[in-house]
């Protein structure tokens, strides 16, 4: 059996309206790349990146969901096993911000109770086209007791910081396992397919 190259696996989810830049945020973090020609995500896709936090190698499995309503049934089935969820809106699109309340309700309905949440106001490099003041993002984050960052995938503002902060918040809540424990507990999301068991 191949030796595990990581200590912990965290499943993260990106949600928000179509066109807010979720895929760009993910690619900036996973590949340090920005592409202006992405087509809308169909259904769901994911990337993996391993980071080191507090001396532990943590594999981040980051799922990028489609924002369109027609994919709602597919994407909400992925909420259940998520340990961290990033809600993304576009600071140049007021409707995408208004819909954050809908996305928060989706989390309440479909995700685990103890899931870590974070709000991202994306495209902050386009300040001249801003329609959502930063204070509004801060206010909704305060009301829901979640962290908030304004980000730009294009010029790489706060992308890595947001992902690492979310991972650190999850790590803080993760029980420490015995170092000699070889078994992967699939009921706690310990393996790549482990989180699926929570859908049952």
From Swiss-Prot:
Gene from which this protein is expressed: RAB10
Cofactors (names): Mg(2+)
Stated regulation of activity: Regulated by guanine nucleotide exchange factors (GEFs) DENND4C and RABIF which promote the exchange of bound GDP for free GTP. Regulated by GTPase activating proteins (GAPs) including TBC1D21 which increase the GTP hydrolysis activity. Inhibited by GDP dissociation inhibitors GDI1 and GDI2 which prevent Rab-GDP dissociation.
InterPro entries in alphabetical order: P-loop_NTPase (IPR027417), Small_GTP-bd (IPR005225), Small_GTPase (IPR001806), Small_GTPase_Rab (IPR050305)
Any one Gene Ontology molecular-function term assigned to this protein's record: GDP binding
Stated name of the protein: Ras-related protein Rab-10
GO BP: any one term: polarized epithelial cell differentiation
Its EC number(s): 3.6.5.2
Compartments, as annotated in UniProt: Cytoplasmic vesicle membrane; Golgi apparatus membrane; Golgi apparatus, trans-Golgi network membrane; Endosome membrane
UniProt motif (Switch 1) ranges: 32-46
Motif range (Switch 2): 64-81
Linked residues for Glycyl lysine isopeptide (Lys-Gly) (interchain with G-Cter in ubiquitin): 102, 136, 154
Lipid bilayer topology: Lipid-anchor
């Amino acid at each position: 059996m191949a030796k595990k190259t990581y200590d912990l696996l965290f499943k993260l989810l990106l949600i928000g309206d179509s066109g807010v830049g979720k895929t760009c945020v993910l690619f900036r973090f996973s590949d340090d790349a920005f592409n202006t020609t992405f087509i809308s995500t169909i259904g769901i896709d994911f990337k993996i990146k391993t980071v080191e936090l507090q001396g532990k190698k943590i594999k981040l499995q980051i799922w990028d969901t489609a924002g369109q309503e027609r994919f709602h049934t597919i994407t909400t089935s992925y909420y259940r096993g998520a340990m961290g969820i990033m809600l993304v809106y576009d600071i140049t699109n007021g409707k995408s911000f208004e819909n954050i309340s809908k996305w928060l309700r989706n989390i309440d309905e479909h995700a685990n109770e103890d899931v870590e949440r974070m709000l991202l106001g994306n495209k902050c490099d386009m300040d001249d086209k801003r329609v959502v003041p930063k204070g509004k993002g801060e206010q909704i984050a305060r009301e829901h007791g979640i962290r908030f960052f304004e980000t730009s995938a294009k010029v790489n503002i706060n992308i890595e910081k947001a992902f690492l902060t979310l991972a650190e918040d999850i790590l803080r809540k993760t029980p420490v396992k015995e170092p000699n424990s070889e078994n992967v507990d699939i009921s706690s999301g310990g393996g790549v397919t482990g989180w699926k068991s929570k859908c049952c």
